Curated annotation (Swiss-Prot):
It comes from Francisella tularensis subsp. tularensis (strain WY96-3418). NAD(+) binds at residues 274-288. Keywords: Cytoplasm, FAD, Flavoprotein, NAD, tRNA processing. SUPFAM superfamilies: FAD/NAD(P)-binding domain. It is found in: Cytoplasm. Belongs to the MnmG family. One of its GO terms (molecular function) is flavin adenine dinucleotide binding. Homodimer. Heterotetramer of two MnmE and two MnmG subunits. Its cofactor is FAD. This is tRNA uridine 5-carboxymethylaminomethyl modification enzyme MnmG. NAD-binding protein involved in the addition of a carboxymethylaminomethyl (cmnm) group at the wobble position (U34) of certain tRNAs, forming tRNA-cmnm(5)s(2)U34.
């Protein structure tokens, strides 16, 4: 049966990538259908009950700056908020929030269900409608065909998903859910490169069986931060509660090493490669055999939940072994496991087969986002869902496209890494992956991206006005401070002396004074004659960072300008690299396979040398492809 409701975009999957994708295309005005195997699991946190962290928090802020739902949802559902690296520079500070799982899912559903242009239908997708190498719709398990101009696949770990607990394996997309084997087989029949990856989750513990008195207490920040740029004064956080910290020990490690042959990872049952930066407890004990203990974050799953998430104990060991090593840990001596930990392996498709828009190179109008591209994490998934669906929506009746770059966002870094380098293990974001960290901060994500969000129609009128007011306040106040001078012999200078390490010897602007490490905006406000009445902390923060890091920021902007030339030089999709004399066979093969869209993208493909880029540039200039 064909249901032709005139959909512009179909999003397959209701996880974190799917939610951002469905929301984005609908906000732009595209008639959107979200297809999910179970409406009740939309927005579900399948693994850890937390959002953000180093690198990841930057992604959440950027999604929010583009009008996404993740930051607002966690503001409604977060039960502990912390700023990580708060004593370090602004480039590496990151927000992390512990979530109440039920409140988070409720918040996501509230935001999605009230979104115009968005329909939701419950059924698994088994097949795609593909005509002349162009996707035209999706076919569900019950035989219903939904036609659309664009399809975005955000299927998580469900493609050929297999769950392992010890040597017991069964098919599953996650615990309690069936995998999407029919869709996996269909995708394998298309000209995409496919491989397997693995991830895992720890056992869940009944909090009533845990002795918290012997653990370290970890409180959230006070005042409680907000994730969304648009939440303060509108959203009230739930009650805030602490997390706890405990540690493994030598006994824990012995139990694990004595039973490694029973682990699905170490017995050879799992083919997929696991995440390097979120390893199982088995991997930690083997790879870091010299460490006497490993830190475990004991995280509540919700205000009214009795389940605890022991972050750091992901495992594929048998249930009996899980019980034994859990009870060897301080505070867990009488722990009762409510759900066993498990590993899951699944299909992913080589992201080098994608364009920067996340449209596939082989099938037109088909987009991939999330774990299907080899990433791990809610935040990475949400970022991809956003970009894929933006491009699906804006290209319906035109050849428009938009994608972030390494110079303007961590989302740009994420996508560029994936499409140029690919991945052999689950990819997660870190601040160290970005070249321009000082520019790509959490605090200025809106200043970097919200203008584009306004242009694309992604922000509500209210959020748009909030952003414009903030941006104008920053511009106006910086201009005022750059044009307000204080002479060394004035009363203002004498009033400032109590704050200065060295007396003023020449006339300075307020902006230059703010560059001094001992001066901040609040101290300048104490000089009554200056009439600095600004009270908006977010605006003040931007003014201070602009002043104190101005030299570094200018340097990074110059670096960006140098590389921008290559980024602007487009390579036609049908470009014949064999015509370029002097390219090695290796370079020729890689360029032909990956089909980079710009010279900048080509330059970042592993194995492509500066000499090869030079030859390519000269040829393209001679033949008129670039000026």
């Amino acid at each position: 049966m064909i249901y032709d409701y005139g959909y512009d975009v179909i999003v397959v999957g209701g996880g974190h990538a799917g939610v951002e994708a469905a929301s984005a295309s609908a906000r732009i005005g595209a008639k959107t259908l979200l297809l999910t195997h179970n409406i009740d699991t939309i927005g579900q946190m399948s693994c850890n009950p937390a959002i953000g962290g180093i690198g990841k928090g930057h992604l959440v802020k950027e999604i929010d700056a583009m009008g996404g739902v993740m930051a607002k949802a966690i503001d409604m559902a977060g039960i502990q908020f912390r700023i990580l690296n708060s004593r370090k520079g602004p480039a590496v500070r990151a927000t992390r929030a512990q979530a109440d799982r039920l409140l988070y899912k409720k918040a996501i559903n509230s935001l999605i269900n009230n979104q115009e242009n968005l329909d939701i239908f419950q059924d698994s997708v088994d097949d795609l409608v593909v005509e002349n190498n162009t996707v035209c719709g999706a076919i569900t398990k019950t035989g219903i065909t939904f036609r659309a101009k664009k399809v975005v696949l955000t299927v998580g770990t469900f493609l050929g998903g297999k769950i392992h607990i010890g040597k017991v394996s069964n098919a599953g997309g996650r615990a309690g859910d069936q995998p999407s084997n029919a869709l996996a087989a269909r995708l394998r029949s298309l000209p995409f490169r496919v491989d397997r990856l693995k991830t895992g989750t720890p056992p869940r513990i009944d909090r009533r069986s845990v002795d918290f008195s012997v653990m370290e207490v970890q409180h959230g920040d006070n005042p409680t931060p907000y994730f969304s740029f648009f939440s303060k004064g509108k959203i009230e956080h739930p009650r805030q509660i602490p997390c706890y910290i405990t540690y493994t020990n030598n006994e824990t490690h012995k139990i694990i090493t004595d039973n490694l042959d029973k682990s699905a990872m170490y017995s050879g049952l799992i083919e997929g490669i696991g995440p390097r930066y979120c390893p199982s407890i088995e991997d930690k004990v083997v790879r870091f055999a010299d460490k006497e203990r490993h830190q475990i974050f004991v995280e509540p799953e919700g205000l009214n939940s009795i389940e605890l998430y022991p972050n750091g104990l992901s495992t594929s060991l048998p249930f009996e072994v899980q019980c034994n090593y859990i009870r060897s840990i301080k505070g867990f001596e009488k722990a009762f496991i409510m759900r066993p930990g498990y590993a899951i392996e699944y299909d992913f498709f080589d992201p080098r087969d994608l364009k920067p828009t996340l449209e596939t190179k082989h099938i037109k109008n088909l987009y991939f986002a999330g774990q299907i591209n080899g990433t791990t994490g809610y935040e990475e998934a949400g970022a991809q869902g956003l970009v894929a669906s933006i491009n699906a929506a804006i290209s319906i009746d035109s050849d428009k496209s938009w994608y972030p770059t390494r110079a303007d966002s961590y989302i740009g870094v994420l996508i560029d890494d994936l499409i140029t380098k690919g991945t052999k293990e689950p990819y997660r974001m870190f601040t160290s992956r970005a070249e321009y960290r000082l520019i790509l901060r959490e605090d200025n994500a809106d200043l970097r991206l919200s203008d584009k969000a306004c242009e694309l129609g992604l922000l509500s009128k209210e959020d748009q006005q909030h952003f414009i007011s903030k941006k104008n306040a920053i511009i106006e106040n910086i201009a005022m401070m750059k044009n307000t001078w204080i002479g060394p012999q004035t009363q203002k200078a004498r009033d400032l002396e109590k704050f200065l390490d060295k007396k003023m010897t020449r006339e300075s602007t307020l902006f230059d004074l703010l560059k001094r490490p001992e001066i901040d905006y609040s101290k300048l406000q104490q000089i009554s004659e200056l009439n600095l009445n600004l009270q908006d902390d977010a605006v003040i923060e931007q003014i201070e960072i602009s002043a104190k890091y101005s030299g570094y920021i200018e340097r990074q902007n110059k670096d960006i300008e140098k590389t921008a030339t290559l980024e602007q030089k487009a390579i036609p999709t049908d470009f014949n690299y064999s015509q370029v004399k002097g390219l090695s066979n290796e370079v020729l093969q890689k360029l032909t396979e990956q089909k980079p869209t710009t010279l900048g993208e080509a330059s970042r493909i592993p194995g492509i040398t500066p000499a090869a880029i030079s030859l390519l540039t000269i040829y393209m200039k001679k033949t008129g492809f670039i000026k």
